[in-house]
């Protein structure tokens, strides 16, 4: 049951590759695609830093990558959209708890796999901007030559853009979690959902 809190293998594998294109630059205002293109070097610099390659530095390396994720992902928006109508029934304290747990789940589920990236090319194929909303379309070329389309849905925040959904081969990360969370809440309770997320986090924190 705990595994149902994590997206499928195809989603997780492609997402961790796509995350390399999502390191915020913290620079002046840029168009969404320009921000994605310019930001890849920040993550690659962490992965290629010789000081962070030895096994004992793995926690430091992971923390550096997670910090970059915090800069580009709108975890509040992702959490709210993933809970959908159930979000409205939560107190402010419950919302804060959920955002904290869910963002930790996302980061640990995907960031821990980031080092599996081995140079797969990322092609930027288009951009649609509608006010404060944008979609950047890309595709990943896998080692066997398969093209995997990945779309990034983004919200404008100040001078930059934050990602609130990733759509891989037509499957939305947010919609995937929304369906899982809704099933658990409907068949059990919101409290049970929190317990399952906490249990999954314990699994991810346990060294293997």
Task: State each model region's role.
Residues 37, 44-46, 99, 123, ...:
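Soluble periplasmic/extracytoplasmic beta-strand elements of cell-envelope proteins
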Residues 1-8:
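N-terminal secretory signal peptides that target proteins for export/translocation
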Residues 168-208:
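Low-complexity, intrinsically disordered terminal/linker segments enriched in charged
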Residues 10-23:
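Bacterial N-terminal signal peptides
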Residues 147-175:
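Short beta-strand edge/turn micro-motifs at domain boundaries
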Residues 31-110:
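Early exported N-terminus immediately downstream of N-terminal targeting peptides
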Residues 108-148, 197-208:
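Surface-exposed, charged secondary-structure patches
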Residues 23-30:
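Bacterial Sec-dependent signal peptides at the C-terminal "C-region" and cleavage site
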